[in-house]
Amino acid sequence: MNIQFSKMHGLGNDFMVIDNVTQNVFLSKDTISRLADRNFGIGFDQLLMIEPPYDPELDFHYRIFNADGSEVEQCGNGARCFARFVKMKGLTQKRIINVSTAKGKIQLKIEHDGNITVDMGKPILEPAKVPFEAQKEEKTYILRVEDHTVLCGVVSIGNPHCVVLVDDIDNAPVETLGPLLENHERFPNKVNVGFLEIKSRDHARLRVWERGVGETLACGTGACAAAVVGQLQDKLNPHCTIELPGGELRLFWQPGQSVKMTGTADFVFDGQIQI
């Protein structure tokens, strides 16, 4: 099987993007994992699969697979790349694109400056729906990790996130605490872990340990989760900039509303591979 694909990235969070509207591609979990290998494959953080809409009122459906081959519910940086891809490839002429994912519906808007705004939907704070094991909804939760106590915020942006505030992002224990929290027993579906340093009420720095991937240069849903948790803990304003290793995202959220994220999406190259 010969597969046409594109390589794209959002702030360094990189993707293999496959048009499954004009192709008929099925990839096993093992095949995706092999393609994700940066030495022996294409190399990517996630694979995005664009498909025809399941709902006639929507424009597309898209699926997201991590580098380990597992399918996940949502990806903010991937959503921006999705929007640029379908416009660039002539799959749509619309500037406002409505799509479905495994977790629900999102709206993408291609701005006149080329940036893309994603309406990520309302954040989920109810523990059982994240899912997260807790007696009741709190702004801050206490987790026991080995011999340590960790304070964190927990939210779902279509996928689960745990956000830990730190004083110094450059020395945050991302590679040690990240995988421990990812696999913590109170997160039955595992969790993405964000380490957040507040610089001001309008600006914060973030590093993310992504579930099934490891640390990435950027995580769109992680930035959304950080903006929500930062505001719930009275650290951030509704409009704020989240700075990730790969670049900046602009966020807007008010309680009871959808989270809106604006940022870039970059095309790298087109290719084909024989499977």
Curated annotation (Swiss-Prot):
Its main location: cytoplasm. Pathway: Amino-acid biosynthesis; L-lysine biosynthesis via DAP pathway; DL-2,6-diaminopimelate from LL-2,6-diaminopimelate: step 1/1. It holds the Pfam family DAP_epimerase. This is Diaminopimelate epimerase. The gene is dapF. The record marks 161, 210 as: Could be important to modulate the pK values of the two catalytic cysteine residues. GO terms for biological process: lysine biosynthetic process via diaminopimelate. One of its GO terms (cellular component) is cytosol. GO terms for molecular function: diaminopimelate epimerase activity. Catalyzes the stereoinversion of LL-2,6-diaminopimelate (L,L-DAP) to meso-diaminopimelate (meso-DAP), a precursor of L-lysine and an essential component of the bacterial peptidoglycan.
